[in-house]
Each structure stands twice: as structure tokens, then as C-alpha cells.
């Protein structure tokens, strides 16, 4: 999942990070965040 496609902000809240974290949780990781336009999951 690339964060560039999901990137938008509402009142300072970056929704792409939440979508990335949800994606990572869905594949069994402990969450994640966007780094340089790429969703990086935590182990």
C-alpha cells in the first residue's frame, strides 16, 4: 500500500497513516505508518 494514493489531511489529521496502520493490522502486524510515501508495517 502506498501512502501517496491515500494521502489527504483533515484539520491536521493525516488519514493515510491510519489507513496504513489498519492495513498492517489486517495482515497481522502491530500497526505501521507512512515513511517517504510508503506504508511501513511494524513487526
Swiss-Prot record:
User: What family does the Swiss-Prot or TrEMBL record give for this protein?
Assistant: Belongs to the invertebrate defensin family. Type 1 subfamily.
Leader sequence range is: none
Q: Known Pfam families for this protein?
A: Defensin_2
Location of this chain's protein in the cell? Secreted
Spell out the InterPro entries in the cross-references: Defensin_insect, Defensin_invertebrate/fungal, Scorpion_toxin-like, Scorpion_toxin-like_sf
**Purpose:** Antibacterial protein. Strong activity against the Gram-positive bacteria M.luteus, B.megaterium and S.aureus. Reduced activity against Gram-positive bacterium B.subtilis and weak activity against Gram-negative bacterium X.japonicus. No detectable activity against the Gram-negative bacteria E.asbriae, E.coli, P.aeruginosa and S.marcescens.
The identity of this protein, by name, is Defensin-A
Spell out the disulfide connections: 3-34, 20-39, 24-41
Q: Which GO terms describe its cellular component?
A: extracellular space
Q: Which UniProt keywords apply?
A: Antibiotic, Antimicrobial, Defensin, Disulfide bond, Immunity, Innate immunity, Secreted
Question: Which GO terms are recorded in the biological process aspect for this UniProt protein?
Answer: defense response to bacterium; humoral immune response; innate immune response
Amino acid at each position: 500500500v502506498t501512502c501517496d494514493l491515500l494521502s489527504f489531511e483533515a484539520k491536521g489529521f493525516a488519514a493515510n497513516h491510519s489507513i496504513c496502520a489498519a492495513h498492517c493490522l489486517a495482515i497481522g502486524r502491530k500497526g505501521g505508518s507512512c515513511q517517504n510515501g510508503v506504508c511501513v508495517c511494524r513487526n
